[in-house]
Amino acid sequence: MLLSDRDIRAAINSGELKIDPHDDQMVQPSSIDVRLDGLFRVFNNSKYTHIDPKQPQEELTTLVEVPDDEAFILHPGEFVLGATLECFGIPAHLAGRLEGKSSLGRLGLLTHSTAGFIDPGFTGHITLELSNTANLPIALYPGMKIGQLALFTMTSPAEAPYGSGTLGSKYQGQRGPTPSKAYLNFQN
């Protein structure tokens, strides 16, 4: 069941749902608006001949910090990693779904490629997979509204929530845009 604004506020006020920084004006009728952090991971296109998900490729991306009063310019066809300004703590009985903002989608901005699902138990900043599908560059400003997180009540709390240690949980506690750790899926 999708949480309403009333349910979202109750979960925040009870301490079940953690959001830092929290601004009550970000609570919408059935979601929480999320803002863009000033950290981005830009791909080093000349460093590797290809992307190999079996290999760590630690120099595949470079961390770039954009000051609050400046814009990061996302060029047509470009893909970068960003992150939410907010750090979340999702309880074991809730799951989340991150969606883009309609107004930005109408400009050609995609906020995620495939990773829009947020597991129960997740803590950290949500990494954004930002793509510009327009034919003009898009200016992205730290602090701007970039997406919205809808929260769903599960039929029962997860037995092994994300980060519990029984799962891989390789992105638990992430700060800022976190590069892929797909190579860990190939290890026994």
From Swiss-Prot:
InterPro entries (alphabetical): dCTP_deaminase, dUTPase-like_sf, dUTPase_trimeric
CDD domains linked to this entry: trimeric_dUTPase
Keyword Nucleotide-binding: yes
Catalysed reactions, semicolon-separated: dCTP + 2 H2O = dUMP + NH4(+) + diphosphate
Alphabetically ordered keywords of this record: Hydrolase, Nucleotide metabolism, Nucleotide-binding
Pathway: Pyrimidine metabolism; dUMP biosynthesis; dUMP from dCTP: step 1/1
GO biological process: dUMP biosynthetic process; dUTP biosynthetic process; nucleobase-containing small molecule interconversion
Pfam families membership: DCD (PF22769)
One GO molecular-function entry: dCTP deaminase (dUMP-forming) activity
Site (Important for bifunctional activity): G116, F117
Family from the record: Belongs to the dCTP deaminase family.
Described function: Bifunctional enzyme that catalyzes both the deamination of dCTP to dUTP and the hydrolysis of dUTP to dUMP without releasing the toxic dUTP intermediate.
Protein name: dCTP deaminase, dUMP-forming
Organism encoding this protein: Corynebacterium jeikeium (strain K411)
